Amino acid sequence: MKKVIDCLKENNPVIQKKLREVSVEEGMEIARELFEILSERKDGIGLAANQIGYDAAVAVVNVREPLILINPVIKEQWDEIDYYEGCLSYPKKGVHTKRYKNVVIHTEQEESDWYFSGTEISTEGKGTWEEQNKKQDQELRILESVCVQHEIDHLNGISCIDKAVDTTIRRTEKKWGRNEIVGITDGKDYKEIKYKKAKPLLDSGKWEIYIGGPIT
């Protein structure tokens, strides 16, 4: 079985290449291998063919359900959001990016388009449990939408490293209460603590406010 090529240590000649289109049959075969690698690693939610050295426009996503993307094309995207994501090809190199909450794509093996949306879905339920459940569902939908965009970028020779944005100004705009719970990350670990306890870590430059995102 092939492995994900660590681009920080090894050369990957196809990681920055726009990949060739493939037949559905070839795409399905590659997708099976990609899912096997994800299943064995257990540390990713998406994978593109060029991450393991194949010149083939095929990727898989597994957030809410397993999805296969063969020669995918983004047709529409809207509602830009800030995100924080990582990549199996660039371990421990999380970056802030700009993504879209909603995206419509077309894949080779399906006649109809696929619509991924992080827009909150209204429910009849009320109360703490219902609100938490609704929030978790929305977060998963956004994660799935971003992961799809991340993998399609890979197939066009673009990684999240290429899309990294400077967040210096954005971070200073937000004022946090001393007792407000914030999520912070050092690119590897994640923790939720009160801002007054997080501030020394943030000031050290080794930790930053976590926006949330996939490692794919």
For each of these PLM feature ranges, what is it?
Residues 1-181, 185-192, 196-206, 211-216:
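Positively charged
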